């Protein structure tokens, strides 16, 4: 086993119990392509038992990365970081907390066509969300092409939203298209679902321009990690769909100004990486 932990300089995160040596990390090092670095892997995971300090260590690295000039987006499904403006007054002006609730004023805010800047990205995400909710596989030669055609048609409209996909399916007026339209529409009755479905008139109101952005979604009901997809309840399907949209939006943020080191922090990542 190696006794080499971390870098020679960087953020102090603790010390090795075996050697007594301090451990430092430079989170941005792997992304800079520095000659001689051991890895250029950009993904990190905090794994351990309940109460083992995963969140604390994670929060520490994000905090110091921001102090060193980085930019971060934290997806906080359990809303554990809502008080950071008060507890971190030294960077309060750079903290942006986005609270997403099922209030009617937020209708359509997380519609793929609203939240994604690029239409092609929005179209791809729309397909992902609708196939996830309905369980229609891309290998389903009867239903998938019909759904795909409706989504592509909506993407070509000047204003677009997921509710228009239902309209396009009804215009097709076949037994298959009506069945898919009814299936998708059955989700829109839930208060929570209105975040995902817009009529094309909603404008993106989520900004990630601050150095530290925290996205919180109220009332998420996440499935247990041992629950199979077939056992998900409707509200669990919608909750995971919302996490997929937000995480895709956050990852899109990575591709903005590449001169700035960025972190996308997915708390409870197992819920949508399973």
Question: What residue spans do the PLM features occupy?
Answer:
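P-loop NTPase motor domains
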Residues: 2-22, 79, 86-89, 102-274
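Glycine-rich phosphate-binding loop of nucleotide-binding enzymes
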Residues: 9-99
């Amino acid at each position: 086993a190696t006794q080499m932990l971390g870098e020679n300089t960087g953020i102090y995160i603790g010390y090795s119990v075996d050697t007594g040596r301090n451990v430092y990390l430079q989170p941005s090092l792997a992304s800079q392509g520095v000659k001689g670095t051991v890895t250029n892997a950009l993904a990190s995971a905090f794994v351990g038992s309940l109460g083992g300090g995963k969140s604390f260590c994670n929060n520490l690295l994000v905090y110091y990365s921001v102090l060193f000039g980085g930019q971060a987006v934290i997806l906080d499904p359990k809303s554990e970081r809502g008080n950071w403006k008060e507890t971190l007054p030294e960077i309060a002006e750079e903290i942006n907390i986005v609270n997403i609730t099922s209030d009617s004023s937020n209708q359509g805010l997380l519609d793929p066509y609203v939240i994604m800047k690029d239409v092609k990205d929005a179209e791809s995400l729309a397909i992902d969300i609708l196939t996830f909710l309905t369980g229609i596989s891309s290998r389903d030669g009867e239903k998938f092409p019909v759904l795909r055609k409706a989504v592509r048609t909506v993407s070509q409209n000047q204003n677009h939203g997921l509710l228009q996909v239902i309209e396009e399916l009804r215009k097709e007026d076949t037994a298959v298209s009506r069945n898919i339209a009814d299936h998708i529409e059955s989700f829109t009755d839930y208060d929570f679902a209105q975040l995902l479905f817009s009529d094309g008139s909603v404008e993106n109101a989520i900004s990630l321009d601050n150095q530290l952005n925290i996205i919180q979604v109220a009332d998420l009901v996440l499935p247990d990690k041992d629950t199979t997809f077939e056992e998900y309840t409707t509200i669990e399907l919608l909750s995971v769909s919302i996490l997929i949209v937000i995480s895709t939006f956050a990852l899109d943020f990575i591709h903005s100004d590449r001169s700035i080191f960025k972190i996308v922090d997915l708390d409870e990542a197992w819920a949508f990486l399973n």
